[in-house]
Amino acid sequence: MKLFGTDGVRGKAGEFLDSFLAMRLAMAAGIYFKDKSITNNILVGKDTRRSGYMIENAIVSGLTSIGYNVIQIGPMPTPAIAFLTEDMRCDAGIMISASHNPYYDNGIKFFDAHGNKLSEDIEKKIEEIYFDDKLIQASKVDMEKIGQAKRIDDVIGRYIVSIKNSFPKDLTLKSLRVVLDVAHGAAYKVAPTVFKELGAEVIVMSDKPNGLNINENCGALHPANLAAEVKRLRADVGFAFDGDADRLVVVDEKGEVANGDSLLGVLALYLKEQGKLQSSVVATIMSNGALKEFLNKHGIELDTCNVGDKYVLEKLKVNGGNFGGEQSGHIIFSDYAKTGDGLIAALQFSALMLSKKKSASSILGQVKPYPQLLTNLKIAEKKDLDKIKGLKELKKDLENKNINTLFRYSGTENLIRLLLEAKDIKLLEKEMKNVVEFFKKALNG
């Protein structure tokens, strides 16, 4: 049985991800990190889901039972956990979140002592430990060696300082009216504080988490309400975060939702113009063809990798690069953070607007993405795509019509993601119907 997906362990809280799994997974991870232990402390944070309390208590029980001390810091963005794990000299960090998923899902992500997400090899080792009953039993310590847990509520200041340090010292946000949609999630305190302290006029939306409303018709996956509010208030820009604030969606002053690849393109050019861009930009295989064209036009190379911000970071390390991201809004400025950070990306875009003295729409309009259609199709089983009869012929036919394709399974759900890209939207709509019917028969038959 495989536990880890694209981004940690994720599933329906109380069913797949119950307290037993959380406790045993924490023990397995703790056993793995014991060999590298320096401080014997592990940091645990979460987003605002009600199930986070159940999972957090189970994780604390598992870790303390094998002798670890646990530092609990409450609701905090995923990138904050990555930063604070290293900043507070912990052996590892754990984030309890299902990111952009609905409240009834939850997840567990791990970070090493340096704030990096774990490689697939390490995740595999933790899975092996998880299923080793003898090793799990043998790891339990005597009564006097059981670990302690303590809750610290004031670490938010450390993260805020680190975020503000990413913003140019010679700029201020005083001239900007900004609308923030924090998705009733982990950034509901941090995001408004950062923007207010840097001088912006801030209007906040979806900042009243009740444990059940995270991501509900708000945030990065549902930016329509933010777009309407930006127009109504005549704001300069709107920023929408997801439940754990590791992704960003930008809305311009006209209420138009920016394409994620347009955002990547203009931020990459901004870094280059400052002389800060190192090596090539990294995006995923789902990136728009227009991004590559835009970057190449400005003398910037683009490399691609699998979907997931940890793969973007891995590729950046190999290339010696410092900027990359995903169309979905995960944007990595590795000079400032080791994972996608929506707040850092929002501040960098704000700095770009201020330094150019241009509107959000005029900046984002530099990159004109080709039409793409993405369909998430629920499926009964995940067959090997290379062995599906007729798929090669289907892809060849689409290629002959100048349609780019990407078909991939979700790492966390029973879905196949079907992506088509071409210059003719009507052709895409027609062909997507055929593609959906093909996969319905192939995977639900």
From Swiss-Prot:
GO molecular function ontology, one term from the record: phosphomannomutase activity
EC nos: 5.4.2.10
Gene Ontology biological process terms from the UniProt entry: carbohydrate metabolic process; peptidoglycan biosynthetic process; UDP-N-acetylglucosamine biosynthetic process
Alphabetical list of Gene3D superfamilies matching this protein: Alpha-D-Glucose-1,6-Bisphosphate, subunit A, domain 3 (3.40.120.10), Alpha-D-phosphohexomutase, C-terminal domain (3.30.310.50)
UniProt keywords, alphabetically: Isomerase, Magnesium, Metal-binding, Phosphoprotein
Record PTM text: Activated by phosphorylation.
Free-text comment on the cofactor: Binds 1 Mg(2+) ion per subunit.
Active site annotation, chain numbering: S99
Amino acids binding Mg(2+): S99, D242, D244, D246
Record's catalysed reaction(s): alpha-D-glucosamine 1-phosphate = D-glucosamine 6-phosphate
Phosphoserine modifications at: S99
Pfam name, any one: PGM_PMM_III
Disulfide cross-links: none
Entry GO CC: cytosol
Co-factor(s): Mg(2+)
HAMAP family the record matches: GlmM_B
Annotated function: Catalyzes the conversion of glucosamine-6-phosphate to glucosamine-1-phosphate.
Similarity comment: family membership: Belongs to the phosphohexose mutase family.
Protein name in the entry: Phosphoglucosamine mutase
Lineage: Bacteria, Pseudomonadati, Campylobacterota, Epsilonproteobacteria, Campylobacterales
